[in-house]
Amino acid sequence: MRHRKQGRKFGRTSSHRKAMFKNMSASLINHELIKTTLPKAKELRTIVEPLVTLAKREHKLRQELDTNSNEFKAQSVALRRQAFDFLRNKAAVTKLFEEFGARYAERAGGYTRILKCGYRFGDKAPMAFIELVDRPQVEEAADEE
C-alpha cells in the first residue's frame, strides 16, 4: 500500500529522478518558463517554491541587517549554499538570489503557475507550461508592412 508516501517515481531510479529535477529546476530559474509533462510540472513546483523562499529569506536579511556585518554574511552564505547544494548551478543560484528574492518579497507563496497546453503528439502525454509568476513579459517585435 502506498499510504502516506509522498512524491512520484516517474519510472526512474532515485538518482535519475534527482538529477532530472535538478536540471529542470535550474532551467526554470534561468528561463522562467519551461514546457514539460503535467506530472513533472506538479512535482517541480514542490521543489522550486522552497528555493524561492530561501531567496526571500536572504532578501529580508539584506533589509534588516547591515550587508557588511559578519552575521549577514554568514547567514547569506549559508542560504546560498543550501540552494547550491540542490541546484549545482552558479548562474541559477545567482539569479535566484539577486532577482527572485526582491521580486517575490511581498508574495506569500505561490511563485509558480502551471498552464495545461494539450497533449504530446507521440504518446498523448498531458503537457503543461510551468512558469514563474510576475515574470517580465518579452514583447514580440511587430512586423510593419
UniProtKB/Swiss-Prot annotation:
**Intrachain S-S bonds:** none
**GO annotations of cellular component type:** cytosolic large ribosomal subunit
Q: Name one GO molecular function term.
A: structural constituent of ribosome
Q: Extract one GO BP annotation from the record.
A: translation
Q: Does the keyword Acyltransferase apply?
A: no
| Keywords of this entry | Ribonucleoprotein, Ribosomal protein
List, alphabetically, the Pfam families matched. Ribosomal_L17 (PF01196)
Keyword Ribonucleoprotein included in the entry's annotation = yes
Q: Which family does it belong to?
A: Belongs to the bacterial ribosomal protein bL17 family.
User: What HAMAP family does UniProt report for this protein, alphabetically?
Assistant: Ribosomal_bL17
Q: How does it assemble?
A: Part of the 50S ribosomal subunit. Contacts protein L32.
NCBIfam families found in the cross-reference section: L17
**What protein am I looking at?**
Large ribosomal subunit protein bL17
